[in-house]
A protein has these predicted regions:
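Noncatalytic carbohydrate-binding groove/subsite architecture in carbohydrate-active enzymes
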Residues: 177-190, 217, 225-391, 396
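Glycan-recognition and catalytic regions of carbohydrate-active enzymes
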Residues: 389, 400-468, 494, 503-506
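Carbohydrate-binding surface patches
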Residues: 450-491, 527-534
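Short, hydrophobic alpha-helical membrane anchors of single-pass surface/secreted proteins
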Residues: 541-551
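C-terminal membrane-anchoring or membrane-association module
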Residues: 556-569
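Mobile, glycine-rich extracellular loop/lid and propeptide segments
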Residues: 117-120, 127-137, 166-190, 198-231, ...
Length: 569
């Protein structure tokens, strides 16, 4: 997928109150005020990302991660990996089964293929997961039983430093897999982090708090907090020694109980009491900060967590697919609020046990400010469900808006079997017109008086001449009249309107707004939808729909359904 680079722009987020569970009147209008020159805040483009397995011809992504449980036991020398509890502790060639042919029989094929995919998809930021578990799959295929646990012939020991000469062809007959040789090999093939093709960052493995469960053939007992720090410091130091410009992500916490206590790590209670930590994230940040003080090098650039909503719908199930149940759909839309809204209490086991660290983002930032200032935040896996329904698109759009508002640096959605609506929502931020135009990098001030919608506003660079506004509607059945006032010295003339709604993943181009008076717009927003309004300060001829569709095919590929149909309401 080849598209134009995302132009520098300015983005604004305003969440219009708490998303109520009650129904809304049909004439419940929303009044939105946008102040393009006020309260600017930078936004990272890398929040618009995906994990491997997503067809990059279907989404204009800005970041890409190669991760997941299999990467913990990935042997770069022969491309074998072990699935752990995900699939019968099977060792096989799964990670390169769909790789480009040229990478299936060479060392590091999974990593090289990830770089190749990202380059073909015009994705500027790539993150590679490194192995910290301790052992990786050997050359022996098949199910690994309990009596074949490491150390055994079914595994190769991972050693960070070879302390010897690197080889362009790793020795597959010894009993070790060397991480420094792996990094050197990748740099020789695709370059360092400052090159176009090199990995920009490395993750310190994947979900270590679950190793004793997901990879019980290697890690038989729950990991101690102190063990994780020791492993993390050693591997992070190696990364910085090898490629000083690369960013380090860690510790890839799988969910709430990992944030809290590293999922009940054996030494957590003692460490918490001795240091008055609130949760494991405090300890991890503090220890990595101490490691920087000792080494003179920052060893953790980005705090890496995973988040899958635990909120239950009216049916009592987590992230259900009961789209004909209004209560279940509303629960999905509301669940995003656990990231930021102190007045929201989701229906989940987390709330039942106190939900001490909700809302999540303010609590994370508090820990960063106290224990390791300037650490960035990443959600390298997340999903709010509904990938096959418009509610999933609305939840995804709100998630991206919240990531923008709270300064998240990097985010890559982990897609399930169905992801079309979620990817379409991402395209509303990165490629709404099929020609590569999207949102950018700074918040501005907005205000709204209606609980039923969320509003995200943007300008290009520092130029108030074009204002872009995304509105998400949480009303399941009725249109919402929205009155928009732009408080700016610029005089606005016309606007384009794009929308994602109903039973289609197409981004539709609706009727243009041809005349704007007194910097005010009134528009009816479709129920359960994502709408983008692109407002121009001077009269610009509308691009013919045929030309836009042709540009979409060139920019995103013929396989992408970004149908810009000019329609009425």
């Amino acid at each position: 997928m080849k598209i134009k680079k995302l132009a520098a722009a300015v983005i604004s987020v305003i969440i219009c109150g708490a998303f109520s569970q009650t129904a809304y009147c049909e004439d419940d209008a929303a009044n939105v005020n946008v102040y393009p020159s006020e309260d600017h805040k930078n936004i990272s483009p890398y929040i618009y990302g995906v994990n491997s397995g997503v067809d990059l011809n279907t989404v204009s992504a800005k970041s890409f991660r190669l991760g997941g449980n299999r990467m913990s036991a990935y042997n770069w020398e022969n491309n074998m990996s072990n699935a752990g509890s995900d699939w019968k502790n099977m060792s096989d060639m799964n990670l390169i089964s769909s790789a480009a042919e040229q990478f299936r029989r060479v060392p590091g094929g999974a990593a090289l293929n990830a770089s190749y995919e990202a380059q073909n998809g015009n994705v500027p930021y790539t993150l590679l997961t490194l192995q910290m578990l301790g052992y990786v799959a050997s050359s022996k295929k098949g199910q690994v039983s309990e009596d074949m646990a490491a150390p055994s012939e079914y595994w190769k020991k991972v050693v960070n430093r070879k302390n010897g000469e690197f080889s362009s062809e790793p020795d597959k007959k010894d009993n070790y897999v060397y991480t420094d040789e792996y990094l050197n090999y990748l740099i020789e093939k695709i370059g360092k982090s400052d090159s176009e093709t090199g990995f920009k960052a490395y993750a310190l493995d994947n979900e270590p708090a679950l190793w004793h469960s997901t990879h019980s053939r290697v890690q038989t007992e729950p990991l101690k907090c102190s063990e994780l720090i020791e492993k993390s410091v050693d591997l992070a130091s190696l990364v910085k020694e090898t490629d000083s410009g690369a960013e380090v992500f860690g510790p890839s916490l799988f969910g709430y109980s990992a944030y809290d206590s590293l999922a009940g790590a054996p030494d957590w209670a003692e460490l918490k009491a001795a240091n008055n930590y609130r949760w494991f994230i405090d300890y991890y940040l503090d220890e990595m900060h101490k490691a920087e003080s000792e080494s003179g090098t920052r060893l953790l650039d980005v705090l890496d967590i995973h988040y899958y909503t635990e909120a239950k719908g009216e049916c009592g199930e987590r992230s259900c697919g009961h789209y004909d149940n209004d209560g279940c759909v509303k629960a999905r839309l509301d669940s995003v609020r656990s990231l930021y809204d102190e007045n929201y209490h989701e229906d989940s086991w987390i709330t039942d046990t106190g939900a001490e660290f909700f809302p999540l983002l303010p609590n994370i930032q508090e820990s960063i400010d106290k224990y390791y200032p300037d650490t960035k935040i990443a959600f390298t896996e997340y999903n709010f469900g509904g990938g096959d329904h418009i509610s999933g698109a609305v939840a995804q759009a709100d998630t991206l808006g919240i990531f923008a508002k709270y300064g998240v640096y990097f985010a890559t959605i982990w897609s399930f079997d169905q992801n079309e609506y979620q990817l379409a929502a991402m395209n509303m931020f990165t490629n709404y017109d099929g020609a590569g135009n999207g949102f950018g990098d700074t918040l501005v001030k907005s205000e709204c008086d209606n609980d039923n919608i969320s509003v995200y506003s943007s300008i290009d660079g520092e130029d108030e001449g074009t204002v872009k506004i995304i509105i998400t509607s949480h009303d399941l059945h009725n249109e919402t009249p929205v009155n928009i006032k732009l408080s700016s010295d610029s005089r606005y003339a016309d606007a384009e309107v794009y929308a994602l709604y109903g039973d289609s993943t197409e981004i539709h181009r609706l009727d243009d707004i041809s005349k704007i008076k007194d910097n005010s717009i009134s528009i009816d927003i479709k129920p359960l939808s994502v709408t983008e309004i692109v407002i121009h300060s001077d009269k610009k001829s509308a691009v013919p729909v045929i030309a836009v569709c042709a540009a979409a095919l060139i920019a995103v590929g013929a396989g992408v359904c970004v149908a810009l149909k000019k329609r009425g309401k």
